[in-house]
Amino acid sequence: MTEFTLSDLERIVAERAGMTDGSSYTASLVAKGQTRAAKKLGEEAVETVIAAVEGNRADVVTESADLLYHLLVVLKIADVPLNEVLAELQRRTAQTGLEEKAGRPKA
């Protein structure tokens, strides 16, 4: 089995977002707009948290998959490539968490 990456999923989301034959959940979600997609992302985040708190490993896996998928849909609608998010993670992990937090702008 070849390794499946988030970049693979990002490509699939982009392909399916443009489908017009009514067969794609992704296209349907994108057509409903960012508010709906973000709401779904939030729902999946909560479901992932619940699975983790309950210690249900299988549900953590499936809900995490849903969470990552919906995050990539939200990023697609926002026109934010996954590489930008990965670059930010790389920037943050180049220093300790406390150093990164101290460098954030004050609210």
Swiss-Prot record:
Pfam families: PRA-PH (PF01503). Pathway: Amino-acid biosynthesis; L-histidine biosynthesis; L-histidine from 5-phospho-alpha-D-ribose 1-diphosphate: step 2/9. It is found in: Cytoplasm. PANTHER family: HISTIDINE BIOSYNTHESIS BIFUNCTIONAL PROTEIN, HISTIDINE BIOSYNTHESIS BIFUNCTIONAL PROTEIN HISIE. The gene is hisE. GO terms for molecular function: ATP binding; phosphoribosyl-ATP diphosphatase activity. It comes from the Bacteria. This is Phosphoribosyl-ATP pyrophosphatase. Keywords: Amino-acid biosynthesis, ATP-binding, Cytoplasm, Histidine biosynthesis, Hydrolase, Nucleotide-binding. Disulfide bonds: none annotated. Its main location: cytoplasm. The keyword ATP-binding applies. It is an enzyme of class 3 (hydrolase). GO terms for biological process: L-histidine biosynthetic process. Its EC number is 3.6.1.31. Gene3D superfamilies: MazG-like. GO terms for cellular component: cytoplasm. It catalyses: 1-(5-phospho-beta-D-ribosyl)-ATP + H2O = 1-(5-phospho-beta-D-ribosyl)-5'-AMP + diphosphate + H(+). NCBIfam families: histidine_hisI, PRK00400.1-3, PRK00400.1-5. InterPro entries: HisE, PRib-ATP_PPHydrolase-like. It comes from Brucella anthropi (strain ATCC 49188 / DSM 6882 / CCUG 24695 / JCM 21032 / LMG 3331 / NBRC 15819 / NCTC 12168 / Alc 37). Belongs to the PRA-PH family.
